[in-house]
Amino acid sequence: MALPVSLLMALVVLSCHSICSLGCDLPHTHSLGNTRVLMLLGQMRRISPFSCLKDRNDFGFPQEVFDGNQFRKPQAISAVHETIQQIFHLFSTDGSSAAWDESLLDKLYTGLYQQLTELEACLSQEVGVEETPLMNEDSLLAVRRYFQRIALYLQEKKYSPCAWEIVRAEIMRSFSSSTNLPQS
């Protein structure tokens, strides 16, 4: 389902505000990167989500990984990094290149890569400050299993256009949720 532009922009503002408030000196371009990735995902829609209602699926996004005050900065940044890395991997598959406009897909790769680079620099800075583990093993597994469920769904649906549309909408939702971290 296509999100109204006002709702999409509200999600972007919340995401940008929260990730930038982590205090790890992420450049302003990181929040712009969040906006750009969400806008690109929105532009990638090829078919009406209403024609794919029968294909909807609950992938079990691990919201608990991104909720609450259980994270310090390095763990929060690490969780976002893992999510973006998994999104990059998902859209880098052979099935993905056949499903999407190549130009938009290339822009998405570039945007995600820039996000990863900025987060890695931020992680390096934060790890030097604190000696805490980057990400709880259970949290890491929860994020990876979530993306495994998505990959399995695509495989079971034979990478159909509706399956990709459901996944695209899910990734928009999870990207918004994963970058909307608590302030620390």
UniProtKB/Swiss-Prot annotation:
Residues 1-23 form the signal peptide. It is found in: Secreted. Its main location: secreted. Gene3D superfamilies: 1.20.1250.10. PROSITE patterns: INTERFERON_A_B_D. It holds the Pfam family Interferon. InterPro entries: 4_helix_cytokine-like_core (IPR009079), Interferon_alpha/beta/delta (IPR000471). One of its GO terms (molecular function) is cytokine activity. One of its GO terms (cellular component) is extracellular space. Keywords: Antiviral defense, Cytokine, Disulfide bond, Secreted, Signal. It comes from the Eukaryota. The keyword Repeat does not apply. The keyword Oxidoreductase does not apply. Produced by macrophages, IFN-alpha have antiviral activities. Interferon stimulates the production of two enzymes: a protein kinase and an oligoadenylate synthetase. Belongs to the alpha/beta interferon family. Interacts with CR2. This is Interferon alpha-1.
